[in-house]
Amino acid sequence: MIPSLSRMAVLLLTSGFTVTASGNPHFSADEIMTWSSRSFSGETDYQLIEQNGYKVLQAQSRGNASALYLEQEINLTNTPYIQWCWKVSNVYPGLDETTKQGDDYPARVYVARKTGLLPWQIESVNYVWASSQPIGADWINAFTDRAHLLALQSGGSKVGEWVAEAHDVSADYAKLFGKKVDHIDGVALMSDGDNASVNATAWFTHIAFSSSASLPECPSS
């Protein structure tokens, strides 16, 4: 019997090739909009919009879930930090995010790596804007132990505000999976509300990998 697959595993399995990134990979909103899309339950509506002179990606989930993803090998030895800016319209109060019924997030960014040739041999870290779990909390995905979630933001205190993030992917894999890794094989983002039939809008811009832990410059809220 094939073990349950994480959503990131499904994304990587839909592509037949891997591109290796050179330099410091940086993805503008225009570039993210060209990434492949994968539906899990209906379609999250992705659009390019302008906010305060910045072009950003808007993701509207109305009780559905689809992701934009890129399969690309990224060298974490040279660029271990992932950076991005995000904003959400609301959170989902009352969800137990450690359960299958509560596995919904107004915004999430994934990184993943292949650990073998078999389809389920993929490990992913999900950076999420949590509704109930506190900032800094981490937990195993309810659908598979090959996906770990890490709450970078939580609750409504910063709803409607742009927030800059920078996280050491190598350190997070060491903490969550107990192993040192030197590369990942894919990155993705999503706003989803399919399990609990909830709605939210998220905005993303400036996804990049860097040797520096410095925060990106976000649009003004």
Q: What are the language-model segments listed below?
A:
Residues 71-82, 156-159, 180:
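Extracellular/lumenal carbohydrate-interaction signature centered on repeated Trp-anchored short motifs
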Residues 21-41, 216-221:
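Extracellular carbohydrate-recognition regions
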